[in-house]
A protein has these predicted regions:
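Conserved C-terminal structural/oligomerization subdomain of aldehyde/semialdehyde dehydrogenase
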Residues: 92-252
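ALDH superfamily catalytic-core signature
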Residues: 1-112, 236
Length: 252
């Protein structure tokens, strides 16, 4: 539903705000964008207006060499640096007014552990992916990205379609989804989205954590449970299992 210039401009602004915070070093900063083919070109133009530099294929290969080693491990000296510095390390120059770099990632075929631009960047660079057809194709790309990394943390969606938002929420292995807002600002908690303010985000069992909430004061407080005898209130197995109940399950 990012199908008007105004909505594309807002989505691009949200992307720029999230990508550029702390030079893109935060886990909540945008790393991969999945955009429908029908609005892709116009959205890229909106990103450029917001300060994106679109790297060509040769520049993208140079960036890859200074961001990851030959085994795919992220190189620390290009983490959290300005886009001009990142380009300089890669061997090319970008204008001084550019706020971040974007590489064109392609489609579903370019997502996977062997495709490094689909992994976490931790700097002022993002990858732009394009999908055609039904929204399910975008969800398939989301699944693939989280197989590369980032399960449990977060994602965002710029949409006014409640069905699309619901379908993403039902399948994405994340603890928080930001709708039409900068991911890094929204994840950390805001008076305009109801998320508890925090700098620590639980990622649930997806991320090896015990909670999937924003870590807040309640998580640092010890709770003492006082249990007194009460009348037994034991549901039947049929009530517990519902449609999965089979006759004889409660026979010892």
């Amino acid at each position: 539903t990012c199908n008007t210039p105004e909505r594309q401009a807002e989505a691009a602004m949200n992307t720029r705000i999230s990508k550029c915070s702390d030079f893109g070093s935060g886990c909540s900063c945008d790393g991969n964008i999945i955009c429908h083919a029908s609005v892709y070109d116009d959205f890229v133009k909106a990103l450029v207006k917001e300060g994106a530099y679109i790297a060509n294929a040769d520049e993208a290969e140079k960036l890859k060499l200074v961001m990851w080693d030959e085994t795919g491990h992220r190189l620390p000296d290009t983490v959290a640096i300005a886009p001009q510095k990142l380009a300089e390390k890669a061997g090319f120059e970008i204008p001084a007014d550019r706020k971040f770099i974007a590489v064109t990632g392609g489609g579903r075929e370019n997502i996977g552990k062997e495709h490094l631009f689909s992994s976490e960047k931790l700097t002022t660079l993002m990858a732009l992916f394009k999908y055609d057809g039904e929204f399910e194709n975008a969800l398939d790309m989301v699944r693939a990205i989280y197989e590369v990394g980032g399960k449990g943390h977060s994602c965002g969606i710029y949409s006014f379609d409640d069905d699309h938002i619901h379908r993403l929420a039902m399948m994405a292995p994340v603890s928080r989804i930001m709708v039409r807002q900068p991911n890094n600002k929204g994840n950390a908690g805001s008076a305009t989205n109801g998320m508890p303010p925090t700098s620590s985000m639980g990622c649930g069992t997806w991320g090896g954590n015990i909670v999937s909430e924003n870590i807040a004061l309640k998580h640092y407080m010890n709770t003492t449970w006082v249990a007194r005898p009460i009348p037994e209130d034991m549901p039947s197995l049929q009530e517990l299992f519902g449609d999965f109940y089979k006759d004889g399950m409660d026979v010892e």
